[in-house]
Amino acid sequence: MRGFVILDFGSQFTQLIARRLREMGFYSEIHSFEYPTEEIRKKNPYGIILSGGPNSVYEAGSPQRNVAELRNISPVMGVCYGMQLLTHQLGGKVTRAEHREYGLNYVTWSSPVQGVPERQKVWMSHGDVVEKAPEGFKIIANSDGHHPAAMQGPGVLAVQFHPEVAHTDHGMDLLKYFAQGMCKAPADWDAPHIKDILIKEAQDKVGPTDHVLVGLSGGVDSTVVATLLTKALGAERVHCVFVDNGLLRKNEYEAVLESYHRIGLNVRGVDASEEFLSALQGKSDPEDKRKTIGRVFIEVFDKSYDHKLPIKWLAQGTLYPDVIESVSSVGGSVTIKSHHNVGGLPEKMKLGLVEPVRELFKDEVRALGAQLGLPKEMLWRHPFPGPGLAIRVLGEVTKEKLQILKEADDVYISELRRRGLYEKIWQAFCVLLPVKTVGVQGDSRTYDHVLALRAVTSSDGMTADWYPFEFQFLREVSNLITNKVKGVNRVVYDVTSKPPGTIEWE
């Protein structure tokens, strides 16, 4: 699909640029700053955006790009490092700032931009500044530090701040000005369009006769994938497997399997809990656990279907943030953790891999699911990781620890639902810590587990803030858990945002 190409120079905010453009209806995709010019030309993008990055354009080994070539393809926007790169390569001058501009600042526009006020609050993060704009360019905004904050030239817009972050006021308006005002792009990226595109892509990739095996987890992503493929290929060619890996929440296997039958999926339930728990025995490293679970899933799938059927593909609900978190970028991003749908898969798969929603964010998947007719209660379940409770039991996974965690999680989530808080929260769960503490229960000394409660708000899983529960709620839930769940005598609440933490603990 025609849209915008975002070249990643290593900024932690690059994904937000894509996110913001899509929110406004403009399709966008992220590529390395080294993405070949000819490949960009083939995509015929409406516009090209150069992201920010941690480097200086003068540093040896800093990411570089021939921006003159890009200008011959479509309008170009530079953000932070992208502005410095444009200046440096087009004959302007970039120097080290005497005082670094970081965090909230204000800029004043000398030339009006549609939708953006003359004085604008922005988020900055840079140590270099533009001293002289390239020939033919005009400085159109300055910071309170008297440095150029934006410039414009033929087919080029560049800003020395981050319009994509929420801290920047009217940042969306600035991106919209580039997308519509300069690039004349139509805002045609929406759920009906996404559905039509993905159905056709699935039909083209799988072909007219091949069958697909879908591993269902009970979560939104795999459910939407199975429904989409069923719509595209027909239920007789889409074979869903829902595995009881022993790592699901309390009573989840039976309830979810029934809901799958109700929406018309061709699904088979498989009890493989002993296989998973046996494989996880003695493993405490989170990466080891994830990859072990990925391996066993493939082994279970391989035994769960009729090999006489022409099944050639394995489908997964991998999302864009999963891919982003699992791929190291030359521009400066680093691998955070392997995702169970990416790094956790064995290299020698017997089936090809199809990931229909790989380029979508979570809210886009939910919108797609609604377009496909899935009920609200299935679409708004909190995200649940493929490795399940194995990465919420820190350290080695045992049946005893899983039982404790299942009971505690059931108490916690039930209280959230009862008090009308569940739908206000992006994701909530319990984590069983690998430590025990001394306590007193019923006049007796105890030495039991510590349980952490986690609840975050987010729009796409890329960033997240901890949910500000009232203290009375935390007091009451803590009392309920320590009274009802044998094996827990201390409850703590995680008040870490993402970043610096990830949403899951492992």
UniProtKB/Swiss-Prot annotation:
Pathway the protein takes part in: Purine metabolism; GMP biosynthesis; GMP from XMP (L-Gln route): step 1/1
Molecular function via GO: ATP binding; GMP synthase activity
Keywords: ATP-binding, Glutamine amidotransferase, GMP biosynthesis, Ligase, Nucleotide-binding, Purine biosynthesis
Coiled-coil region list: none
Matches recorded under Pfam families: GATase, GMP_synt_C, NAD_synthase
Domain Glutamine amidotransferase type-1: 3-188
Source organism superkingdom: Bacteria
UniProt xrefs under CDD domains: GATase1_GMP_Synthase, GMP_synthase_C
Residues involved in ATP binding: S217, G218, G219, V220, D221, S222, T223
Gene Ontology CC annotations of this record: cytosol
InterPro entries (alphabetical): Class_I_gatase-like, GATASE, GMP_synth_C, GMP_synth_GATase, GMP_synthase, GMPS_ATP_PPase_dom, NAD/GMP_synthase, Rossmann-like_a/b/a_fold
Record field: catalytic activity: XMP + L-glutamine + ATP + H2O = GMP + L-glutamate + AMP + diphosphate + 2 H(+)
Active site (catalytic residues): C80 (nucleophile), H162, E164
PROSITE patterns linked: GATASE_TYPE_1 (PS51273), GMPS_ATP_PPASE (PS51553)
Known EC number: 6.3.5.2
Subunit annotation: Homodimer.
Function: Catalyzes the synthesis of GMP from XMP.
Protein name stated in the entry: GMP synthase [glutamine-hydrolyzing]
Annotated source species: Bdellovibrio bacteriovorus (strain ATCC 15356 / DSM 50701 / NCIMB 9529 / HD100)
Source organism phylogeny: Bacteria, Pseudomonadati, Bdellovibrionota, Bdellovibrionia, Bdellovibrionales
